[in-house]
UniProtKB/Swiss-Prot annotation:
The chain crosses the membrane at residues 68-88. Serum transferrin receptor (sTfR) is used as a means of detecting erythropoietin (EPO) misuse by athletes and as a diagnostic test for anemia resulting from a number of conditions including rheumatoid arthritis, pregnancy, irritable bowel syndrome and in HIV patients. It is linked to Immunodeficiency 46: An autosomal recessive primary immunodeficiency disorder characterized by early-onset chronic diarrhea, recurrent infections, hypo- or agammaglobulinemia, normal lymphocyte counts, intermittent neutropenia, and intermittent thrombocytopenia. It comes from Homo sapiens. This is Transferrin receptor protein 1. The modification Phosphoserine is found at S10, S19, S24. Changing D648E: 57% binding to transferrin. Residues 569-760 are annotated as: Ligand-binding. The modification Phosphothreonine is found at T21. Glycans are attached at T104, N251, N317, N727. Residues 1-67 are cytoplasmic. Belongs to the peptidase M28 family. M28B subfamily. It is a single-pass type II membrane protein.
Length: 760
């Protein structure tokens, strides 16, 4: 409308602009009225081209009283129009058509005159305080108790009650209003007991029945289904050293071992490597002080993770791979037995167990000459559908980078400590962080994924299948895994297992979180990092680190001794609360540890992964190798290239630290490029020279197989023993490939190829 009026006014005078009008209709924040400025003098164009003007013939102007009268009428008309127009604009809400016509925009207000300050940026101290406040008002024990009710117990993987709990977790995620909730399903093979009972029998030398020792209630998944007969030999915990210290050979014999110290799968693998024909596992009273001597228990014997019948690839229903079998499956029968059954067997054995074993007085070493043991295992394979449940809080800056927080959901028995606590922590953390985002102004830069895994009891099957399904891309997106399984098993100690990349973050967290019972900060020992234990095969964090190259951490509040009821029917809420009366406080502390991990990893501009920690790991390896310099020299080899690779890695970390120091922290593009280099450090310690299918745990520090640095050292040690077991060809390959893996990690950390200063 205004443009038309101005156009008409201009055309009246032959198109020459004789005046202009400027409006400012925006209401000021301080409440001043809008105003109008009008000029009726002819403004000359100051920047016009004089030569152009000279060539333009201006039309003749009208003259006399008619012309002046016309001007006066138009001026008074415009003044009246403006007064009415502005009066209308004052009567409407901000951001109306008036403002848009005027070309200005007023601040958005909910009520006239009300002042709204801009949202304050939340810093570390703010977020830490908000997390603590939410933790104080959270009832963890109520949720743990709920998950231990009959509708969810027992919840063996693939069962209806496992699915019931999966749907409950999924619904809870939706109620928490996470950014997105989804599930994935896999069809996997597990092993279950057959209708024909497993048995342990004492027989005479002719194989005739003396008496039945036990039909065990528990079993060991992935055992070979077979019947074997032989003498029984005790091998303590079944570690490699335990077998080395035995005076009695175990070839052709059944081995009996105590539970604890290492996984069932490792015990079985050690026994099988020495040609044992079967393994029995029991819980002694010294290490597991359980009153009920008849208590049975469960475990698995797969020396690996995931579905052992789809090794290295995911168990999706639409993939049709040829029949395959993990090399980690045992070829001998394995069975758990009760303590009462073990004592019956000891009654038919001779020789006291060594005093340094520190076990029960009833322990004996080997069956008498007239007796043998017959072991029958009849387990069968069963294909089941499992569900993994996910929820995500999307990041505000880098949503494609995420930290994963996960917990096992299934359990062979009630699973209060084994999976109930972890699932409760997962649900409460998801709820708290969603509230912090929706209500408290928390804006994580990176995404947070909450994952509920199934079939964890069978070797982290659900978690591993997910990793296998996204092997090619996950390391570019997921930069940390936080495991909540078995986070509360006691109160005396705080223990942690993790990638070295997370050591600095763990230390800062321990300096901020207090022990739930003593009230002292968890950080009490400056040398704590040297006492960190390696992630074990039965920990869901292990495949993240060793298979996918994703930094991972697992922690627990626990005792010096093992929690006795894991994998048994006594893993109930009742037993848990009796052993840990301050369960809610301890669960709160565990949630605070995990919560602070999440905040630091998703909020800070610089990724909290300390890549320089691997310098110490490499230096330690080189020092160990230097002890064998003479042997290496005798083979005509040199360590010079290994030294060079380690030096390149050290220089790459120093250069990256300098780059971070020089970077403008507000430049998101630059910071993302630097963070991307840090994210790939762990991944580049996966050996590129072995197949994920044949050797899934490719990490040269934390994996398993001949490609690892510990395996290289073990092979080299055999040369000094001079027993013909040393394999020089293997060692040459190990040294070369280890060197190039370290060099590759250094090159990747350096950045672009033109930034690599390499005279290797």
């Amino acid at each position: 409308m205004m443009d038309q009026a101005r156009s008409a006014f201009s055309n009246l005078f032959g198109g020459e602009p004789l005046s202009y009008t400027r409006f400012s209709l925006a209401r000021q924040v301080d409440g001043d009225n809008s105003h109008v400025e009008m000029k009726l003098a002819v403004d000359e164009e100051e920047n016009a081209d004089n030569n152009t003007k000279a060539n333009v013939t201006k039309p003749k102007r009208c003259s006399g009283s008619i012309c002046y009268g016309t001007i006066a009428v138009i001026v008074f008309f415009l003044i009246g129009f403006m007064i009415g127009y502005l009066g209308y604009c004052k009567g409407v809400e901000p951001k109306t058509e008036c403002e848009r016509l005027a070309g200005t925009e007023s601040p958005v207000r909910e009520e006239p005159g009300e002042d709204f300050p801009a949202a304050r940026r939340l810093y570390w101290d703010d977020l830490k305080r908000k997390l603590s406040e939410k933790l104080d008002s959270t009832d963890f024990t109520g949720t743990i108790k709920l998950l231990n009710e009959n509708s969810y117990v027992p919840r063996e993987a693939g069962s209806q009650k496992d699915e019931n709990l999966a749907l409950y977790v999924e619904n809870q995620f939706r109620e928490f209003k996470l950014s997105k909730v989804w599930r994935d399903q896999h069809f996997v093979k597990i092993q279950v007991k057959d209708s024909a009972q497993n048995s342990v029998i004492i027989v005479d030398k002719n194989g005739r029945l003396v008496y039945l020792v036990e039909n065990p209630g528990g079993y060991v998944a992935y055992s070979k289904a077979a019947t074997v007969t032989g003498k029984l030999v005790h091998a303590n915990f079944g570690t490699k050293k335990d077998f080395e210290d035995l005076y009695t050979p175990v070839n052709g014999s059944i081995v009996i071992v105590r539970a604890g110290k290492i996984t069932f799968a490792e015990k079985v693998a050690n026994a099988e490597s020495l040609n044992a024909i079967g393994v029995l596992i029991y819980m002694d009273q010294t290490k597991f002080p359980i009153v009920n001597a008849e208590l049975s228990f469960f475990g698995h014997a797969h020396l690996g993770t995931g579905d052992p019948y789809t090794p290295g690839f995911p168990s999706f229903n639409h993939t049709q791979f040829p029949p395959s079998r993990s090399s980690g499956l045992p070829n001998i029968p394995v069975q758990t037995i009760s303590r009462a059954a073990a004592e019956k067997l000891f009654g038919n054995m001779e020789g006291d167990c060594p005093s340094d074993w520190k076990t029960d007085s009833t322990c004996r070493m080997v069956t008498s000459e007239s007796k043998n043991v017959k072991l029958t295992v009849s387990n069968v394979l069963k294909e089941i559908k499992i569900l993994n449940i996910f929820g995500v809080i999307k990041g505000f800056v880098e949503p494609d980078h995420y930290v994963v927080v996960g917990a096992q959901r299934d359990a062979w028995g009630p699973g209060a400590a084994k999976s109930g606590v972890g699932t409760a922590l997962l649900l409460k953390l998801a709820q708290m962080f969603s509230d912090m985002v929706l209500k408290d102004g928390f804006q994580p830069s990176r995404s947070i994924i909450f994952a509920s895994w199934s079939a964890g009891d069978f070797g982290s099957v659900g978690a591993t299948e997910w990793l296998e399904g996204y092997l090619s891309s996950l390391h570019l997106k997921a930069f940390t895994y936080i495991n909540l399984d078995k986070a509360v098993l006691g109160t005396s100690n705080f223990k942690v297992s993790a990638s070295p990349l997370l050591y600095t973050l763990i230390e800062k967290t321990m300096q901020n979180v207090k022990h739930p019972v003593t009230g002292q900060f968890l950080y009490q020992d400056s040398n704590w990092a040297s006492k960190v234990e390696k992630l074990t095969l039965d920990n869901a964090a292990f495949p993240f680190l060793a298979y996918s190259g994703i930094p991972a951490v697992s922690f627990c509040f626990c005792e010096d001794t093992d929690y006795p009821y894991l994998g048994t029917t006594m893993d109930t809420y009742k037993e848990l609360i009796e052993r840990i009366p301050e369960l809610n406080k301890v669960a709160r502390a565990a949630a605070e540890v995990a919560g602070q991990f999440v905040i630091k990893l998703t909020h800070d501009v610089e990724l909290n992964l300390d890549y320089e920690r691997y310098n110490s790991q490499l230096l330690s390896f080189v020092r160990d190798l230097n002890q064998y310099r003479a042997d290496i020299k005798e083979m005509g080899l040199s360590l010079q290239w290994l030294y060079s690779a380690r030096g390149d890695f050290f220089r790459a970390t120093s250069r990256l630290t300098t780059d971070f120091g020089n970077a403008e922290k507000t430049d998101r593009f630059v910071m993302k490029k630097l963070n991307d280099r840090v994210m790939r450090v762990e991944y580049h310690f996966l050996s590129p020279y072995v197949s994920p299918k044949e050797s899934p745990f490719r990490h040269v520090f934390w994996g398993s197989g001949s490609h690892t640095l510990p395996a290289l050292l073990e092979n080299l040690k055999l040369r000094k023993q001079n027993n013909g077991a040393f394999n020089e060809t293997l060692f040459r390959n190990q040294l070369a490939l280890a060197t190039w893996t370290i060099q590759g990690a250094a090159n990747a950390l350096s950045g672009d190829v033109w930034d690599i200063d390499n005279e290797f």
